[in-house]
């Protein structure tokens, strides 16, 4: 069997046998909102008790409160839910949308292409079988979260997000857990508690978006903005030479498990429409696309043959399926193309290269630019957010921050204002390949020229010399630009520049970028960001190995690395690891020092000797030397109670 057939078979088996898979020692918990149907998911990590004293026979323990963390995995980690990918996810937002009374259910699809696909009987085996009815705004209505926010309306989505962003941190009274270093937020507004009104205000001002197509009611509301937690996007999608529908659905579920806040379906191969339907019906997170890719397939891959009619039908097709945000490369103007002639790597964006080729072939501005207002009208009817694409992003360090890149950025700022006229939500896409010392300039330019609309960047990669490790080269840049104010980071996998990522590459990219996003939240001083770090550090100091694993971003890898050298169960309670061994563990020695300091009698004796040393230095040193030998010539001595408790080892 070929490797491709094997991969598809494995993915199909995954789909057919998918069951709830909670994280180790974690449970899905829900925080109740103001109404019965606002139940916000968090992952609650249970921790072992801390040994604080006593004896071997009667040890004294202190409980550790469970840690709640942001959870993107949907019902896939909820044991009360029966997983069935053929039926899709619960329609969480359907009632909220219906209650607003500004949408209608359509009797038929509006897209010509969708009608053709539905009438093609050869696609029956591929098609998602439980197609929902399509919603659209009623005449003269706008159904975007930005529109509601500007009207002063706090939607259920906004309340849901406020609860989600706080992650239940209000319940932590432990001073040690709540300790947090002051951050440097570069002008961001980070309140101690996120309220629904704060969410509404940020959305109304255009500083944040809530991607929430009315035809994707399965999605759990989330927010993208620099005054909130930094988010991470995962890219999936087939190509003309690799992957299948089953594999892409598998990657979707995998992405949400490992922290993908949104997922972009960048499919360019066969059956794009059917693949996207399966993904949307089973996605608890917002889904983004680049409609240009599918439009190009419709004209057999000939960029010059693209036109507004094909693009318009594609936008409607995808909006009615439920796509939450479109990447639109409308800021690439004809006069910017010559600016790329002297670049080392030219135009590296797929969408950008398609538009550039079309502009040159027709010697006019692209239909995305000339029909931009019509694009906004379509988006307003379904609440599709616009992710204004950076078609001229630098593809190499040499091309960073050049005239072409920043010219397009300024045009994106102009288009942002146009979209806001229609109450359409907007984020701005950014680079790319940028050395560390030029990254902040990108953030500063974006804030100035794009009116504080959220920034969404691919990395940036900080060096070009590490194919196979570009998740690391870009993770460095992602952490930096997240700190400076970038709202969402698009992950990069180890396969970047080399091939289509598989399931494990997706996980590696996501863990790397969740790490970068969290580091940025810490640096900004986002309230409560340090709680998980503090809990893990406490577990590490107390040798609670299982708690260390379970609090990690990737518990499986942390546990497997530990067990490579200490696989026995006794290794899970040992007061050392294989790095230093039992005699040289700094944590163990520090514990012994701490216990030693608690011995008040010894402290008093030390003080007496110190006085004697001042009176008679030679006699004092002789006594200290004799004391060291008399107590076994050991560097550190734990208190008696602690030593007895550790005899269990």
UniProtKB/Swiss-Prot annotation:
Membrane-crossing residue ranges in chain numbering: none
Keyword Zinc (UniProt): yes
Record region (Disordered): 620-649
GO biological process, one term: thiamine diphosphate biosynthetic process
Cofactor note text: Binds 1 [4Fe-4S] cluster per subunit. The cluster is coordinated with 3 cysteines and an exchangeable S-adenosyl-L-methionine.
Annotated substrate binding sites: 235, 264, 293, 329, 349-351, 390-393, 429, 456
Names of the cofactor(s): [4Fe-4S] cluster
Example of a GO MF term: zinc ion binding
Residues where Zn(2+) binds: 433, 497
Positions of [4Fe-4S] cluster binding: 577, 580, 585
Compositionally biased region (Basic and acidic residues): 621-632
Keyword annotations from UniProtKB, A to Z: 4Fe-4S, Iron, Iron-sulfur, Lyase, Metal-binding, S-adenosyl-L-methionine, Thiamine biosynthesis, Zinc
Pathway where it operates: Cofactor biosynthesis; thiamine diphosphate biosynthesis
Gene3D superfamilies: 6.10.250.620, Radical SAM ThiC family, central domain
One Pfam family it belongs to: ThiC-associated
Reactions performed catalytically: 5-amino-1-(5-phospho-beta-D-ribosyl)imidazole + S-adenosyl-L-methionine = 4-amino-2-methyl-5-(phosphooxymethyl)pyrimidine + CO + 5'-deoxyadenosine + formate + L-methionine + 3 H(+)
Gene Ontology CC, one term: cytosol
EC number: 4.1.99.17
Oligomeric form and interacting partners: Homodimer.
Role according to the record: Catalyzes the synthesis of the hydroxymethylpyrimidine phosphate (HMP-P) moiety of thiamine from aminoimidazole ribotide (AIR) in a radical S-adenosyl-L-methionine (SAM)-dependent reaction.
The family this protein is said to belong to: Belongs to the ThiC family.
Record protein name field: Phosphomethylpyrimidine synthase
Source species: Vibrio atlanticus (strain LGP32)
Gene expressing this chain: thiC
């Amino acid at each position: 069997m070929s490797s491709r057939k094997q991969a598809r078979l494995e993915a199909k088996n995954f789909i057919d046998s998918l069951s709830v898979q909670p994280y180790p020692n974690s449970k899905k918990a829900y925080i109740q909102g103001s109404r019965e149907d606002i139940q916000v998911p968090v992952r609650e990590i249970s921790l072992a008790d801390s040994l604080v004293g006593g004896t071997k026979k009667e040890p004294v323990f202190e409980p550790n409160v469970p840690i709640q963390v942001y959870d993107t995995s949907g019902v896939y980690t909820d044991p009360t839910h029966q997983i069935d990918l053929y039926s899709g996810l619960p329609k969480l937002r359907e009632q909220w949308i219906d209650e607003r009374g500004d949408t209608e259910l359509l009797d038929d699809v509006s897209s010509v292409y969708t009608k053709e696909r539905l009438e093609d009987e050869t696609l029956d085996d591929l098609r998602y079988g439980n197609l929902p009815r399509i919603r659209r705004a009623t005449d003269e209505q706008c159904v975007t979260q930005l529109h509601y926010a500007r009207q002063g309306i706090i939607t259920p989505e906004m309340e849901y997000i406020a609860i989600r962003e706080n992650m239940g941190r209000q319940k932590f009274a432990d001073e040690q857990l709540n300790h947090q270093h002051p951050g440097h937020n570069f002008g961001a507004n980070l309140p101690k508690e996120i309220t629904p009104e704060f969410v509404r205000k940020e959305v109304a001002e255009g500083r944040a978006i809530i991607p929430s197509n009315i035809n994707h009611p399965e999605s759990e509301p989330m927010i993208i903005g620099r005054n909130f937690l930094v988010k991470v996007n995962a890219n999936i999608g087939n190509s003309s030479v690799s992957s299948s529908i089953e594999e892409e659905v598998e990657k979707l579920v995998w992405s949400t498990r490992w922290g993908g806040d949104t997922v972009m379906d960048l499919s360019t191969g066969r059956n794009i429409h059917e693949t996207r339907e399966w993904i949307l019906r089973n996605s608890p997170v917002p889904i983004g696309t680049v409609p240009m890719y599918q439009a190009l397939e419709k004209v057999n891959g000939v960029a010059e043959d693209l036109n507004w009619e094909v693009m318009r039908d594609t936008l409607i097709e995808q909006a009615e399926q439920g796509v939450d945000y479109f990447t639109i490369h409308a800021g690439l103007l004809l006069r910017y193309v010559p600016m790329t002639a002297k670049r080392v790597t030219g135009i590296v964006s797929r969408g950008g290269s398609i538009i550039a080729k079309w502009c040159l072939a027709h010697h006019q501005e692209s239909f995305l630019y000339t029909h931009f207002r019509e694009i906004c009208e379509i988006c307003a009817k379904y609440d599709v957010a616009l992710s204004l694409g950076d078609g001229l992003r630098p593809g190499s360090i040499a091309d960073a921050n050049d005239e072409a890149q920043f010219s397009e950025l300024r045009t994106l700022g102009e288009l942002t204002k146009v979209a806001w006229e229609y109450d359409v939500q907007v984020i701005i896409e950014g680079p790319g390949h940028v050395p560390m010392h030029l990254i902040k300039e990108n953030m500063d330019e974006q804030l100035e020229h794009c009116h504080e609309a959220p920034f969404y960047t691919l990395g940036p990669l900080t060096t070009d010399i590490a194919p196979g490790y570009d998740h690391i080269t870009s993770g460095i840049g992602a952490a930096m630009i997240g700190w400076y104010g970038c709202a969402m980071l698009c992950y990069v996998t180890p396969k970047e520049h080399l091939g289509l990522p598989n399931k494990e590459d997706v996980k590696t990219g996501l863990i790397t970028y969740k790490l970068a996003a969290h580091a940025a939240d810490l640096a900004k001083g986002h309230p409560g960001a340090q709680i998980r770090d503090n809990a893990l550090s406490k577990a590490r100091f107390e040798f609670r190995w299982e708690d260390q694993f379970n609090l990690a971003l990737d518990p499986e890898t942390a546990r497997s690395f530990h067990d490579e050298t200490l696989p026995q169960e006794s290794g899970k309670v040992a007061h050392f690891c294989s790095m230093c061994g039992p005699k040289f563990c700094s944590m163990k020695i520090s514990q012994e020092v701490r216990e030693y300091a608690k011995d008040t009698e010894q402290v008093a004796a030390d003080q007496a000797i110190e006085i004697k040393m001042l009176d008679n230095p030679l006699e004092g040193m002789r006594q200290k030397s004799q004391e060291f030998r008399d107590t076994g010539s050991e560097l550190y001595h734990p208190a008696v109670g602690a030593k007895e408790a550790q005899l269990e080892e």
